[in-house]
């Protein structure tokens, strides 16, 4: 478990936390996209948990152009304010390109010779964008904030996408949720689950809206999904 540096290909390099499975042999690569709090302990623990299941987990720092090395929590209003400022100040297209190098080259960054690569997004829109725009083998989206602005790309999703949506998400109005579900309905590559009665970040261990039963169900589905599509 370590931090590495990855060339961005445009204007520098960024760090990423890497958790490798035991044994050191080939393993499917999993790019874990951070929440708005940076590559903090929650994200590192999540990567470690995936590595324990046999995945090569990489969590890139998406805030590196603004403020490298952000690690904050969701425990105070000041931290929330800082997190939202970072998120709102980010160039979404560059955020997308930052997530591509780890996905394209888990072998190239000399961690391990990855066989297949997937993405897990804890937060907003990136997994949906990657499913529509990239060559990653499988993508998982938690919570789905802002997806209603991407429904025009739903028909472009040709790789497996699993979506976990909170019914009572304070950041996703019911109208927006239904718009997204209608857009992906009928696409055989998309599986969407709505979790009744839970709020945003219901799967964030230790978070204010953590719901153990819903989290266990969602995380179990995620593990099975990646096992099916990444091997």
From Swiss-Prot:
Pfam families: DLH (PF01738). Its EC number is 3.1.1.45. The keyword Nucleus does not apply. It catalyses: 2-(5-oxo-2,5-dihydrofuran-2-ylidene)acetate + H2O = 4-oxohex-2-enedioate + H(+). It comes from the Bacteria. Belongs to the dienelactone hydrolase family. This is Putative carboxymethylenebutenolidase. It comes from Azospirillum brasilense.
